[in-house]
Amino acid sequence: MDKISGAVYGGAVYVNLTPHELNVVMDDGEIVHIPPSGLKATCDTSTVPVRRIGGATGYRRCYGAVHGIPDPQDGVVYVTSGPAAEAAHRQDVVSPGDQIQLADGRRACKGFAVWDED
């Protein structure tokens, strides 16, 4: 994992595969800042028209193949968008948890959303 930035906390390296800076509130209350790594995970997306909603069409968004997630490495957790994490379906790929606003006005998330079955 040469020259990929991440944050180390609790025995894991968190690599942010989104273009956004992340503040994650850990279980002990610590706020861990995870900067963008410079890599970006993407997920193929298509839309299917479902129904009319007033004067607009309502679409179902469908997700397909994931791109840009490195191979698994011991102790490394990759943080991606929810759709990319769900499509990847790997234990080492997560997405930001519930969004909150900190007392100082910064946005953060509470932990991570997981998308594997284990």
What are these regions (language model features)?
Residues 1-13, 19-118:
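Intrinsically disordered, low-complexity segments enriched in small/polar residues
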